[in-house]
Amino acid sequence: MFQTSLPLPSNDGENTIEIEVIEKTWKCPTCTPKEQHVLEELQKRTNIRDRNALAAIMGNIKQESGFKAKICEGGAKVPYKQCRYGGYGLIQWTTTNRYNNLGKFCKKYDCDPSTIEGQTRFMINESAFQRYLSEFENAGFSIEQYMVPSYYWLGWGIKGNRTHYAYQYAGKLVWTE
């Protein structure tokens, strides 16, 4: 739930009346705290409001890392600086540039590249995600249709169960204040 206070002019023209605006968001009561964090940040930091778009992103993250931040491709559970090859983290940043940019981002913005919080911040701000963000912000498409920008954002080699996971998330998301 996101709350905002908006000042409105009163009838006498001098005083203002504050009203509270409460925006509804998608919640996942049965999700893990890590999943809930990513879901909340995606809605807070972007204009993604479509259930299927959010579910597609969540399904992709589950396929890539199982929402484990300290995970190196192949399963080694290590901090950021100890992953020497393959992908790392939530979306398995694989290329040298993407991996290094995670570290640079967290150094610049004082976050830890080994945590869900640091990686979520980077993921949302990363140029690869930003390039396809508008496609996720356009509402009304199927999960399969949101898998197209997901593929270009992530560049996965193996599709795996990401679509299946996305449908599971879509079934668990609840529209609430």
Give the predicted meaning of each segment:
Residues 46-51, 80, 146-151:
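Hydrophobic alpha-helical context, especially transmembrane and signal-peptide helices
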